[in-house]
């Protein structure tokens, strides 16, 4: 009978799965890295030789913004650059060294995410089996979406690494670094602000004495939430993360002015995407003129109907996010996953890059789920299948010039239903008792 190996925690928190003399844990890191590097090289060839480019248009925007910085100009001189200037600074080597530098940076962030996932899993589930750990890591490192998004030159892995770094340092009881990385992640992209309340509640007055493996939703006590709402640990997290965000934002504002605030943050509140959008609000957005594209358009060009959509779309998000937080904040990884899926599914703009937001968290909930590998595959098939009609309709629109906007909207509705179905399945199969079975050894 084969003996099931479990995590043998040592000072380095190393745990490797060995199969027939092969270290599969290390191998999967190597394979994931090699696949990404090969695709970066392939992208150079395809971009030079084929009509359809492999590289994402966003990467061209990043690079143009970095070129502006090198030339002493503002990154916002490049139209459609709607990110923090820090991203343009990071990609200056695109201009000075090689245009593919940024893709390599994003791939490195992919690998950092995998490292952080492993560290969090070992802290959170001390008795996790080596097979389960391997599956968790493979679900990120071999995920075709994470591979594609980074190698095409989208920066979502940078933000994902920051969010997971914050969670990682929470499990390591380093509240200062956790706060800094969280504030940095919100500065880079505003969406991690949805994690603020669950993270705040997770840091209770016993934060430094409780092991990461002792937190489950079975321990939720709503009376204690308000009784110790302003404990010193929570206030430290709030003050340091707020200082990090505000100081970086203020510095960028001093350098670039209002255009920085608008393009980096305000634009995303009123953004309307009438083409590459899975959202259930897509058709309403299509039927109305996009809200605004530049700062100069802001005055007098905000369409009233789209503004209503922009504001109304936040209401179901806020209600659901608060409900999820109150129920699951002690199962922080599960809470963050549910919040991310909910936020993306109900958002007025939903694109492929957003999927990385929850794919980088998904591996953390696999050990506490009653779903088996086959069930996960079925859910993935449902999720992918629901996108088939959307991609078909989008292809007809983009490449054949057919008017398929209504078809795209219907496909978006099916995709929304698929996301809700997956969300319900995850909730029904989340097992706090199973979590406890992983916890008692440390």
Swiss-Prot record:
Belongs to the PIGM family. Pathway: Glycolipid biosynthesis; glycosylphosphatidylinositol-anchor biosynthesis. PANTHER family: GPI MANNOSYLTRANSFERASE 1, PIG-M MANNOSYLTRANSFERASE. The chain crosses the membrane at residues 22-42, 95-115, 177-197, 242-262, 307-327, 336-356, 361-381, 408-428. It comes from Dictyostelium discoideum (Social amoeba). GO terms for molecular function: alpha-1,4-mannosyltransferase activity; glycolipid mannosyltransferase activity; mannosyltransferase activity. Keywords: Endoplasmic reticulum, Glycosyltransferase, GPI-anchor biosynthesis, Membrane, Transferase, Transmembrane, Transmembrane helix. Its EC number is 2.4.1.-. GO terms for biological process: GPI anchor biosynthetic process. GO terms for cellular component: endoplasmic reticulum membrane; glycosylphosphatidylinositol-mannosyltransferase I complex. It comes from the Eukaryota. It is a multi-pass membrane protein. It is found in: Endoplasmic reticulum membrane. Its main location: endoplasmic reticulum. This is GPI mannosyltransferase 1. The gene is pigm. Mannosyltransferase involved in glycosylphosphatidylinositol-anchor biosynthesis. Transfers the first alpha-1,4-mannose to GlcN-acyl-PI during GPI precursor assembly.
């Amino acid at each position: 009978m084969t003996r099931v190996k479990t995590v043998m925690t040592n000072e380095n928190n190393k745990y490797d799965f060995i199969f027939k003399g092969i270290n599969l844990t290390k191998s999967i890191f190597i394979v994931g890295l090699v696949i990404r590097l090969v695709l970066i090289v392939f992208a150079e060839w395809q971009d030079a030789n084929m009509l359809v480019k492999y590289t994402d248009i966003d990467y061209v925007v990043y690079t143009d913004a970095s070129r502006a910085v090198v030339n002493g100009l503002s990154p916002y001189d490049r139209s459609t650059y709607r990110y923090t200037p820090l991203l343009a600074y990071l990609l200056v080597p695109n201009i000075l060294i090689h245009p593919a530098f940024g893709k390599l940076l994003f791939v490195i962030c992919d690998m950092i995410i995998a490292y952080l996932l492993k560290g969090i899993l070992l802290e959170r589930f001390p008795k996790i089996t080596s097979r389960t750990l391997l599956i968790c890591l493979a679900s990120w490192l071999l995920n075709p979406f994470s591979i594609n998004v980074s190698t095409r030159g989208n920066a979502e892995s940078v933000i994902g690494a920051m969010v997971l770094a914050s969670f990682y340092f929470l499990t390591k009881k380093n509240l200062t670094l956790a706060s800094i990385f969280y504030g940095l992640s919100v500065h880079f992209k505003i969406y991690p602000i949805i994690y603020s309340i669950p993270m705040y509640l997770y840091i209770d007055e016993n934060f430094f004495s409780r092991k990461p493996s002792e937190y489950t939703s079975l321990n939720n006590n709503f009376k204690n939430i308000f009784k110790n709402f302003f404990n010193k640990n929570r206030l430290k997290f709030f003050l340091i993360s707020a200082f990090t965000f505000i100081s970086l934002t203020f510095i960028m504002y001093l350098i670039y002015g209002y255009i920085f605030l608008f393009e980096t943050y305000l634009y995303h509140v009123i953004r309307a995407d009438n083409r590459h959008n899975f959202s259930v609000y897509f058709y309403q957005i299509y039927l109305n003129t996009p809200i605004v594209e530049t700062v100069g358009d802001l005055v007098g060009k905000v369409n009233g109907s789209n503004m209503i959509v922009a504001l109304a779309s936040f209401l179901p998000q806020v209600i659901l996010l608060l409900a999820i937080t109150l129920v699951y904040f002690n199962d922080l990884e599960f809470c963050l996953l549910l919040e991310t899926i909910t936020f993306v599914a109900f958002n007025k703009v939903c694109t492929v890059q957003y999927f990385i937001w929850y794919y980088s968290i998904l591996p953390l909930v696999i050990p506490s789920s009653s779903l088996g590998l086959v069930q996960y595959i079925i859910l993935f098939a449902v999720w992918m299948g629901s996108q088939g009609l959307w991609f078909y309709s989008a292809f007809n629109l983009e490449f054949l010039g057919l008017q398929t906007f209504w078809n795209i909207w219907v496909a978006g509705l099916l995709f929304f239903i698929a996301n809700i179905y997956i969300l319900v399945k995850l909730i029904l199969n989340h097992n706090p008792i199973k979590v406890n079975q992983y916890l008692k050894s440390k």
